[in-house]
Amino acid sequence: EFEADVVVLNHPTRIRDGYEPVVHLETASEAATFHPASGQLLPGDRGSVRIRFKFRPYLLEVGQRFVFREGQSKGVGTVTDISPAG
């Protein structure tokens, strides 16, 4: 689980708590759940999101950049904080 600053480039509606795109980070591509700090993000919004990979953990570093997508939805982000596994 990690925190990230994201920018929503395109999305047909709103990104809400529980949104599940595929996150592409380095060589990893994994489904993840998004939990926006503000409750929702609209296209063009920039915000803080808590992200959790659905199936397996990955090694992350603060500052890494990633892309997320699902259908027509696309966005980019930067890892800002990492929660310890537990």
Where are these regions (language model features)?
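C-terminal effector/interaction modules appended to NTPase cores
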Residues: 1-86
